[in-house]
Amino acid sequence: MENGLCSIQARELDEFICDYLFPDTTFLTELRADIDSISAFLKERCFQGAAHPVRVSRVVMGGSYDEHTALKGKSEAKMVLFFNNLTSFEEQLKRRGEFVEEIQKHLCQLQQEKPFKVKFEVQSSEEPNSRSLSFKLSSPELQQEVEFDVQPAYDVLYELRNNTYAEPQFYNKVYAQLIHECTTLEKEGDFSICFTDLHQNFMRYRAPKLWNLIRLVKHWYQLCKEKLREPLPPQYALELLTVYVWEHSNKNQEKVTTAKNFRTFLELVAYYKNLRIYWTWYYDFRHQEVCAYLCRQLKKARPLILDPADPTRNVAGSDLQAWDLLAKEAQTWMQSSCFRNCDMSFVPTWDLSPERQECAFQ
C-alpha cells in the first residue's frame, strides 16, 4: 500500500485513512466478545484450588485491539493478567515463569473446550523454557488478525483502579516504591506492564483525529519494517511522538491538518538525536524522591521519550542504529507527494522543539 500513500495529495490523507486503514467492524465486535470470554475463563481458572493466596484480580487490555487505533490487517495488543497478594515488583519478577506456565496451561485448555467467534490460536515459543506467551485471534475471510502478548503483572494499582483522575498526588507513593525497587534490582523499565491502566487512560479521551493520525503513523511504520527488514525503534515511542505533535497542534489557532501533523512527526523522527519528551500526568516534580529521579533521567543520553505511566522507562530504547535507519526513511518521506498542496508546494511543519521546554531544572 506504499504506492497508495505516495500517490495521493495532502488533502486526501484523511480519506485514505478512512478507506484503507480502518479495521472491519464485524471483526472488532467478534474479537471483543472472544476477549471477554478468554478473560473470564482465565480469571476463574488460574491457580484455582492452589494452596497459596495468589489469584488473578483482573484482566486489562492494552495496545491496538479496539476501534480507537487498531489497523486494518494485522495489529498487536497486550492482555495483562494482574495478580493480587503479591507484595513487590521483585516478586512478580521471580514468579514470572510460574505465572506464564499457569496461564499457558489454561489457554490451551480453553482452545479445546470453547467455540470462538473468530479463529483462536495459542502461539508456542520455539525457545525451551520460554517466559513469553501469546495468542492470536484472526479472521482469514476478513484478512484481519490481532496478536496478543500475554503478561502477568503485580497489581500495584489495585486500590487506585477506579481512580479516573490523572493526578500525581495519587500515585507518588507507588512511583517511589517502583523507583526504589527498579534501581536496586537494576531493572529500570521492566515493570511498565504494571501500569497498563494508566497507559490506556492516557489515550482514552483523546480526539478521534489523533487516533486516526496514530493509525497513519503505524501504517507508515509497517511500510518501513517491510522495506528495511532491520530492527527499528519501538512502535510505542512513535505513538508517543505522535501524541506530542498533536498536543502542540491543538494549542494553535491555525487550521490543523493531518498532513501538517504527520510531516512534523517525520521531522521529529529525522532529528531523533535531540528528542527529550516527557509528561507529568501521573508523576511530577513535587515529590522529593520522584523529582530527584526524574532530574537524573532527563539528563541521560538522547533520544529520550519517557513512558507517561512509568518514569523508569525510556520508551525510545538504546538502539541508535535503528533510529538512524528510520530517520533516513523519514527524511525521504518528507518529500512525498502526500505532503504536497494543490499548487505542488509542500505542507509546512509546526515549529515544534524536539525537547519539552517545561523543565524543573537547568
Swiss-Prot record:
Matching Pfam families: OAS1_C
Tissue note: Expressed at highest level in brain with lesser amounts in spleen, kidney, stomach, liver, intestine, ovary, skin and testis. Not detected in lung, thymus, heart and uterus.
Highest taxon, organism lineage: Eukaryota
Keyword Cell division: no
Induction and repression of expression: By interferon (IFN) and polyinosinic:polycytidylic acid (poly I:C).
GO molecular function, one term: double-stranded RNA binding
Swiss-Prot/TrEMBL keywords: RNA-binding
Xref: InterPro entries: 2-5-oligoAdlate_synth_1_dom2/C, NT_2-5OAS_ClassI-CCAase, NT_sf
Gene3D superfamilies on file: 2'-5'-oligoadenylate synthetase 1, domain 2 (1.10.1410.20), Beta Polymerase, domain 2 (3.30.460.10)
Family, similarity comment: Belongs to the 2-5A synthase family.
Record's function text: Does not have 2'-5'-OAS activity, but can bind double-stranded RNA.
Name by which UniProt lists this protein: Inactive 2'-5' oligoadenylate synthetase 1C
Organism (species): Mus musculus (Mouse)
Lineage of the species this protein comes from: Eukaryota, Metazoa, Chordata, Craniata, Vertebrata
